[in-house]
A protein has these predicted regions:
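Alpha-helix N-cap/helix-start positions at coil->helix boundaries
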Residues: 289-294, 323-328
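Iron-sulfur cluster-binding cysteine motifs and their immediate structural context
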Residues: 23, 187-211, 217, 231-255
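Auxiliary alpha/beta "docking" domains used to position bulky ligands
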Residues: 1-179, 345-368
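Loop-centered beta-sheet repeat module
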Residues: 159-160, 164-205
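Amphipathic alpha-helical scaffolding segments comprising HEAT/armadillo-like alpha-solenoid repeats
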Residues: 277-281, 308-320, 340-350
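Short microdomains enriched in Cys/His and/or Lys/Arg
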Residues: 185, 209-223, 257-272
Length: 368
């Protein structure tokens, strides 16, 4: 006669197996996310999702895992740190001639690594419970990952809308819920270059640099171009300014180590990449999905924001006529360069960026 399943023991084993597979934290939650539905609907109604139509298309199913995968009783949420050693946050940000890539994208595409580990975790569980089914998701299904992570006890949602942990800050990929500990702090809201955090816990994606440089397929609105600075793929500012990230832990995963070609590279060199070279360098990287055209679009904006230099102007002019979308950003960037040359302008860093660099150098010296 088979013994009844000890769910408490199984939960402990799942967390142990997850740790053995390289996850820093493993939590288990139920599927009831109904409390998040009104906020999700209000966010969609305000069009804060921009061009990310899939968010509206799936509607409230994002808050109903049991409808997405009928029969689902529990969701396992995991945390994996991705902060690399020698992240060079400040060094890259304060040199406008270098390209800043969000630190999660410097190494191997996290989707693949995490999905493989989650699959192994699911298979381990099936060895103990053959009748159970599982499906691993890593940004691949329309579910609300952050509310699940909260319910699973991985942390709380900060005012920048990311999950925070007392022990690890927010530089990680997503039992009993954890109390919110942001208090009166609004550092992430005030540091955002484009004012994308429109109210606590609410991000207007249409203003977010990560959205503008990664998700947006068309032209970057002119009002945001000067504010993007040298950020050519994503932005980490709201995380870098967060006091909790003083406790962020370095990753143990070699796959998340920065690729040399993407770590603080000169903008002029990046802008010269052919599509074939772009595809070669970004193979297995999250960056590849935006394609060569949007990559060049982002770099053109950064070159426009860089100090006057004849080399910047020549680089921009060399790619005229390749594509209408790129031309729009090249012409804007050339105009910015000529304006600086004609005014003999001295490069002035934006106050928010200067403040951020000081905070990183003081509070995160190992990553500066």
């Amino acid at each position: 006669m088979s013994q009844p399943l000890d769910l408490v023991q199984l939960a402990q084993q799942i967390k142990q197996w997850g740790t053995e597979l390289g996850f820093q934290q493993v939590g288990i939650a139920d599927t009831d996310l109904s409390a998040s539905e009104p906020k999700l609907q209000a966010w969609l109604d305000k069009q804060y999702h921009g061009e990310m139509e899939w968010m509206a298309r799936h509607g409230m199913m994002r808050a109903r895992p049991h409808e997405l995968l009928p029969g689902t009783l529990r969701v396992i949420s995991v945390r994996m740190n991705y902060l690399p050693a020698n992240a060079a946050f400040a060094r890259t940000l304060k040199d406008p001639t270098l390209g800043y890539v969000s630190r999660y994208a410097l190494g191997r595409d996290y989707h693949k690594l995490l999905r493989n580990r989650l699959k192994k975790l699911g298979e381990k569980i099936q060895e103990q419970c053959a009748s159970l089914n599982f499906r691993p998701f890593v940004d691949s299904a329309p579910i609300l990952e952050r509310p699940i992570a909260e319910k699973a006890g991985l942390g709380w949602t900060g005012k920048h809308s990311l999950i925070l942990s007392r022990d690890a800050g927010s530089f990680f990929f997503l039992d009993s819920p954890v109390a919110e500990e942001c208090g009166r702090c609004v550092a992430c809201m005030t540091i955002c270059p484009t004012g994308a955090i429109v109210e606590p816990y609410t991000v207007d994606a249409r203003r977010c640099i990560s959205y503008l440089t990664i998700e947006l397929e068309g032209a970057i609105p002119e009002e945001f171009r000067p504010l993007i600075g040298n950020r050519i793929y994503g932005c980490d500012d709201c995380q870098l300014i967060c006091p909790w990230n003083r406790f962020s832990q370095l990753t143990d995963e070699e796959d998340f180590s920065p690729r040399k070609a993407l770590h603080a590279p000169p903008l002029v060199e990046l802008f010269a990449w052919s599509e074939a070279w772009f595809l070669k360098v970004t193979e297995g990287s999250a960056i590849r999905r935006i394609g060569h055209l949007r990559w060049l679009r982002n770099i053109a904006v950064a070159l426009g924001n860089a100090p006057w230099d004849e080399a910047h102007l020549r680089a921009l002019e060399s790619r005229r006529g390749e594509h209408p979308l790129l031309d729009e950003h090249i012409e804007w960037a050339i105009a910015q360069q000529l304006k600086k040359r004609n005014a003999d302008a001295v490069e002035v860093q934006l106050p928010k960026k200067l403040r951020l660099v000081r905070v990183v150098e003081k509070g995160l010296p190992r990553d500066a």
